C-alpha cells in the first residue's frame, strides 16, 4: 500500500466506503476519516508525493480524478463535478493544479 506507515488500512477502507457512490466525495470528510488531517506536515508531504503520480511537483486534474485509486486500486474515479470542486478548493493561486503547500492547506482545512 502506498500509504503504509502514514495511514491505517482500516481508516482508508472506512473512508473509501463512505464515498463509494458517485458524487459523494467530500475532501474534508475524506482527509479526516483517513486520519491525514491529524498528521504531521512531513506525513502530509509524503502523501502529496504519492498522489503526484507523474512527479511534476503538482497534483493536476487528471491525477485528482484518480485520487481515490491512490488509496485502493479498486476504488472509483471521481466524477467530473467532484474533480472540479476538489481542484477549485485546493488551487489557491489559480494555476490549474495543486502544489505541495496548497495540498497541506487543503488537508488541514
From Swiss-Prot:
<feature type="binding site">
    <location>
        <position position="102"/>
    </location>
    <ligand>
        <name>Ca(2+) 2</name>
    </ligand>
</feature>
<feature type="domain" description="EF-hand 1">
    <location>
        <begin position="39"/>
        <end position="74"/>
    </location>
</feature>
<protein>
    <recommendedName>
        <fullName>Parvalbumin-2</fullName>
    </recommendedName>
</protein>
<feature type="binding site">
    <location>
        <position position="58"/>
    </location>
    <ligand>
        <name>Ca(2+) 1</name>
    </ligand>
</feature>
<dbReference type="InterPro" id="IPR011992">
    <property type="entry name" value="EF-hand-dom_pair"/>
</dbReference>
<dbReference type="GO" id="GO:0005737">
    <property type="term" value="C:cytoplasm"/>
</dbReference>
<feature type="binding site">
    <location>
        <position position="95"/>
    </location>
    <ligand>
        <name>Ca(2+) 2</name>
    </ligand>
</feature>
<feature type="binding site">
    <location>
        <position position="56"/>
    </location>
    <ligand>
        <name>Ca(2+) 1</name>
    </ligand>
</feature>
<feature type="binding site">
    <location>
        <position position="63"/>
    </location>
    <ligand>
        <name>Ca(2+) 1</name>
    </ligand>
</feature>
<comment type="similarity">
    <text>Belongs to the parvalbumin family.</text>
</comment>
<keyword id="KW-0514">Muscle protein</keyword>
<feature type="binding site">
    <location>
        <position position="54"/>
    </location>
    <ligand>
        <name>Ca(2+) 1</name>
    </ligand>
</feature>
<feature type="binding site">
    <location>
        <position position="97"/>
    </location>
    <ligand>
        <name>Ca(2+) 2</name>
    </ligand>
</feature>
<comment type="function">
    <text>In muscle, parvalbumin is thought to be involved in relaxation after contraction. It binds two calcium ions.</text>
</comment>
<feature type="binding site">
    <location>
        <position position="93"/>
    </location>
    <ligand>
        <name>Ca(2+) 2</name>
    </ligand>
</feature>
<feature type="binding site">
    <location>
        <position position="52"/>
    </location>
    <ligand>
        <name>Ca(2+) 1</name>
    </ligand>
</feature>
<feature type="binding site">
    <location>
        <position position="60"/>
    </location>
    <ligand>
        <name>Ca(2+) 1</name>
    </ligand>
</feature>
<keyword id="KW-0677">Repeat</keyword>
<dbReference type="InterPro" id="IPR018247">
    <property type="entry name" value="EF_Hand_1_Ca_BS"/>
</dbReference>
<feature type="domain" description="EF-hand 2">
    <location>
        <begin position="78"/>
        <end position="109"/>
    </location>
</feature>
<keyword id="KW-0479">Metal-binding</keyword>
<dbReference type="InterPro" id="IPR002048">
    <property type="entry name" value="EF_hand_dom"/>
</dbReference>
<dbReference type="Pfam" id="PF13499">
    <property type="entry name" value="EF-hand_7"/>
</dbReference>
<keyword id="KW-0106">Calcium</keyword>
<dbReference type="GO" id="GO:0005509">
    <property type="term" value="F:calcium ion binding"/>
</dbReference>
<dbReference type="InterPro" id="IPR008080">
    <property type="entry name" value="Parvalbumin"/>
</dbReference>
<feature type="binding site">
    <location>
        <position position="91"/>
    </location>
    <ligand>
        <name>Ca(2+) 2</name>
    </ligand>
</feature>
Amino acid at each position: 500500500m502506498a500509504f503504509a506507515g502514514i495511514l491505517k488500512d482500516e481508516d482508508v477502507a472506512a473512508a473509501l466506503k463512505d464515498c463509494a457512490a458517485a458524487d459523494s466525495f467530500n475532501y474534508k470528510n475524506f482527509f479526516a476519516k483517513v486520519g491525514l488531517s491529524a498528521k504531521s506536515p512531513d506525513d502530509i508531504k509524503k502523501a502529496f508525493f504519492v498522489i503526484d503520480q507523474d512527479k511534476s511537483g503538482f497534483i493536476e486534474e487528471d491525477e485528482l480524478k484518480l485520487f481515490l485509486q491512490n488509496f485502493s486500486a479498486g476504488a472509483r474515479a471521481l466524477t467530473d463535478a467532484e474533480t472540479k470542486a476538489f481542484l477549485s478548493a485546493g488551487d489557491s493561486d489559480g494555476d490549474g493544479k495543486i502544489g505541495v503547500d496548497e495540498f497541506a492547506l487543503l488537508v488541514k482545512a
